């Protein structure tokens, strides 16, 4: 079981931790708290750092939804979004759900797979608040869902559970930053210290290719090697990252 510190006199917290199999540990490095009805992760030995939480309603993701370039964004091109085509996507490495939310806001149905129970708990809470929002709740409930389990084992399990045919598998494995830690965003540093690098990421490509009917998209830092050493069909480059696209079949309406 994953250990975490939390206030055991807070019933909502205790039930969330119980649901995700999180074990109370008075000496745990991380703590889960509710701040303004938002489930938040805090690194206990760095109290000055902001807590980590999932927010689909306000902040950066809301700004990107409104002003981020729509289907002209690189991620939209990578998954094959075009006129009349809105693929069903399994996000095999959901993290804090930001890329999944972008794709869902553009019309894709997205099943998020997250293997770390603390991150899954944060995602569930973010979905809860998103579903309740009057502006985005209706389409979020239709298009965004969460499946918890090992990314490799669960790639096929997630769509089977909802009887969904998958057009695209999207992967964004955690990759070690080559910059010195001071240059890495503090939030990302905390997040990496929680989940670690995805050292088994190369093992994701084969099951992803088996599951996707149309293509697999892998988001990588610009300096990273090809996933599992396999050359992609095409590459869409951005300022600091790239999307490696492994095409199996044409995207058709």
Swiss-Prot record:
S-S pairs: none
UniProt-annotated binding residues for S-adenosyl-L-methionine: 98-99, 114-115, 150-151, 172
Highest taxon of the lineage: Bacteria
EC number: 2.1.1.242
Keyword Methyltransferase belongs to the record: yes
One Pfam family linked to the record: SAM_MT
Record keywords: Cytoplasm, Methyltransferase, rRNA processing, S-adenosyl-L-methionine, Transferase
Main subcellular location: cytoplasm
Compartments reported by the entry: Cytoplasm
EC class: transferase
InterPro entries linked: 16SrRNA_methylTrfase_J (IPR007536), SAM-dependent_MTases_sf (IPR029063)
Entry GO MF terms: rRNA (guanine-N2-)-methyltransferase activity
Gene Ontology CC annotations of this record: cytoplasm
Catalytic function, reaction form: guanosine(1516) in 16S rRNA + S-adenosyl-L-methionine = N(2)-methylguanosine(1516) in 16S rRNA + S-adenosyl-L-homocysteine + H(+)
Function per UniProt: Specifically methylates the guanosine in position 1516 of 16S rRNA.
Family according to the record: Belongs to the methyltransferase superfamily. RsmJ family.
Name of this chain's protein: Ribosomal RNA small subunit methyltransferase J
Species: Shewanella halifaxensis (strain HAW-EB4)
Organism lineage: Bacteria, Pseudomonadati, Pseudomonadota, Gammaproteobacteria, Alteromonadales
């Amino acid at each position: 079981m994953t250990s975490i510190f939390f206030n055991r006199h807070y019933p909502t917290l205790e039930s969330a931790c119980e649901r995700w199999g999180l074990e109370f540990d008075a000496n745990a490095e991380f703590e889960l708290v509710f701040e303004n009805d938002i489930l938040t992760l805090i690194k206990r030995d760095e109290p000055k750092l902001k807590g980590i939480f999932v927010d689909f309603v306000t902040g950066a993701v809301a700004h990107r939804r409104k002003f981020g370039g729509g289907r002209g964004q690189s991620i939209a091109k990578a998954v094959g979004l075009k006129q009349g085509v809105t693929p069903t996507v399994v996000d095999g490495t959901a993290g804090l759900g930001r890329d999944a939310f972008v794709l869902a806001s553009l019309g894709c149905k997205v099943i998020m797979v997250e293997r770390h129970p603390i991150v899954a708990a944060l995602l569930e809470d973010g979905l809860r608040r998103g579903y309740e929002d009057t502006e985005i709740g209706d389409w979020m409930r239709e298009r965004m869902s969460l499946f918890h389990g090992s990314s490799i084992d669960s790639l096929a399990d997630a769509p089977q559970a909802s009887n969904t045919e998958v057009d695209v598998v999207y992967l964004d494995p955690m990759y070690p930053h080559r910059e010195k830690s001071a240059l890495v965003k503090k939030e990302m540093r905390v997040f990496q210290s929680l989940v670690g690098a995805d050292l088994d990421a190369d093992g994701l490509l084969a099951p992803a290719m088996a599951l996707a009917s149309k293509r697999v998209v892998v988001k990588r830092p610009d300096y990273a090697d090809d996933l599992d050493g396999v050359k992609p069909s095409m590459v869409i480059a951005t300022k600091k990252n790239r999307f490696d696209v492994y095409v199996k079949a044409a995207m058709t309406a």
